[in-house]
Amino acid sequence: MDAVVLSIGTELIDGHLTDTNATFLARELAALGIPLRWVAQVGDDLDWIVRMLRRAWEDASLIVTTGGIGPTEDDLTREAIAQLLAEPLTIDPALLEEIRAFFAARGLTMPERNAKQASRIPSCEPLPNPIGTAPGWFVRRDGHIIVTMPGVPREMMRMWHEQAVPRLLPSIGGGAIRFRTLKTIGLGESLVEERIHDLIATSRARIATYAKDDGVHVRITAHAPDAGAAERLLDEVERALRARLGSAVYGTDDTTLGGAILELLGRSGWTLAITEWASGSRLTSLLAEEPAAGQFLRTATILTSQPPLDSSLEEVARDLAQRTAVAAGSDCGLAIIVRIDPGPTADRSVGQAALAVSTPATVVTRTHQITSHPQEIRRRVGLWAAEFLRLALLEASIQESTATSA
């Protein structure tokens, strides 16, 4: 089996959206061992979509499409596949009722134009979409498979994992495939790969690294005769990866960086107060987005003025972290101070950052210097602060636990 990925939508070819779906699917197909022949984007034009589908039909046995299955007149993927295969397109009453129920569950009435999303051809098996109104298609015809999914990334990814992959497995040798992602922070992608390169080369599972906004993710793909064997292989590889990456690993799969920090606070029974000074409040935003933030985050103070030139930022941060904790009546205090001075160009601004964490066990500080655009400086400092806070909390909780047991 080989594959073609076709991303459909005018917004992809006029520069308004980046085709992240194709990148995701390329990685997923590689993990399944399915060679990808080519990837293309095409606008919302019926003739062009049919033309690209015909080419894909000639070049590969698996065609994966995303986009073009919404409710509007320019959503034409269903019509194009029907034309390609010369099959009639009709409304499926059961699908229509599911779409009506989706709206009703949210206290809404389904707009009539959404009825077209319930259309299907005879060779199509509908793919459920529990988080959207657009069912996908799984089509088997003349030795080919067409998988049609929404263009919304979160809908597409869930449909791919829960609906498409299980249906594809019998065609690629059967068995079970399971995935797990280890999330790391504080190590660059090249350093992560350096630490685990032999595991990548020798493991029975596929291991790949991806640089993300919240650190470097290590994706494990386990293909085994059954689900139990696949899970055991995931566990085995995860243990080996954790042994190499150590405390840089902050979670797996759905774990967020903010959630990992709050979990450490909860484990110790501590609360936190934050002062961010000219830093863009990146870390405060990261924590505030978490459902459990209110349990552990006492206060967050945002200062927007430029820090003074005539002071040591590290000493100011140390003092500020302690005073922040005392003022809020919290167990821990965090201070983030950023000073950005102009460079020869905006992209060469000089940023200095001082971080300090006060815990019941100790006060620790760290400084950074970076030359970049001010927005990038603040983004990087936010990640550094998250990593620094997490490690400080981890170390402090270990110290307290050791002292208590002694």
UniProtKB/Swiss-Prot annotation:
Top-rank taxon: Bacteria
Coiled-coil regions, chain positions: none
One Pfam family per UniProt: CinA_KH
SMART domains: MoCF_biosynth
InterPro entries with a match to the protein in the record: CinA (IPR050101), CinA-like_C (IPR036653), CinA_C (IPR008136), CinA_KH (IPR041424), Competence-induced_CinA (IPR008135), MoaB/Mog-like_dom_sf (IPR036425), MoaB/Mog_dom (IPR001453)
Family under the similarity heading: Belongs to the CinA family.
PANTHER family reported for this sequence: NICOTINAMIDE-NUCLEOTIDE AMIDOHYDROLASE PNCC, NMN AMIDOHYDROLASE-LIKE PROTEIN YFAY
Name used for this protein in its record: CinA-like protein
Native organism taxonomy: Bacteria, Pseudomonadati, Thermomicrobiota, Thermomicrobia, Thermomicrobiales
